[in-house]
């Protein structure tokens, strides 16, 4: 799981929860790998999880991370688009993309605030898009299963 905007409070919380469930978590930041790794180290120690820092400061580094990611989450601050359709078109393994940003412009282009598993036709694997206002609604499905 790659978390864009991962060094902020929402990204850190999502990362801790995912890592606690066994996910391979990368907290990404536009500030570079050193900063994101420092944040990951701090919370790894505090919550006994394993997260890694990742550099999302350039288009090249973003595209490189998307090559290996199954799950992508956008948690950057409101009003910043962190991933475009052009980015997502190159995410060959991505099956789920979630965006917690509900303020225009949305954080991940193509994912609307109310999307609940919307098939993103423009992605290689037709990834499921989950919008900010739908995220609270998936909790019961995660706990109970389909």
Can you describe what each PLM-predicted range is?
Residues 76-78, 101-102:
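Short glycine-/small-residue-rich Rossmann-like dinucleotide-binding loops
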Residues 70-74, 97-98:
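N-terminal Rossmann-like NAD(P) cofactor-binding module of classical short-chain dehydrogenase/reductase
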Residues 31-32, 101-104:
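Short, acidic/turn-prone active-site loops that include or flank metal/cofactor-
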Residues 79-94:
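Rossmann-fold NAD(P) dinucleotide-binding segment
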Residues 15-16, 40, 84-88, 109-111:
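Short amphipathic alpha-helical segments
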Residues 103-146:
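Adenosine-phosphate binding glycine-rich loop
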């Amino acid at each position: 799981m790659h978390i864009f905007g991962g060094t902020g409070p929402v990204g850190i919380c999502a990362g801790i929860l995912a890592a606690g469930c066994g996910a391979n978590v990368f907290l990404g930041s536009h500030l570079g790998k050193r900063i994101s790794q420092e944040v990951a180290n701090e919370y790894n120690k505090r919550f006994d999880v394993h997260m890694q820092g990742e550099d999302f400061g350039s288009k090249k580094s973003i595209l490189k991370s998307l090559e290996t990611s199954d799950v992508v989450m956008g948690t950057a601050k409101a009003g910043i688009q962190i991933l475009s359709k052009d980015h997502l078109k190159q995410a060959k393994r991505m099956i789920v993309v979630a965006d917690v940003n509900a303020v225009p412009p949305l954080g991940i282009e193509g994912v609307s605030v109310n999307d609940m598993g919307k098939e993103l036709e423009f992605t290689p694997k037709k990834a499921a898009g989950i919008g900010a206002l739908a995220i609270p609604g998936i909790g019961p499905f995660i706990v109970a299963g389909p």
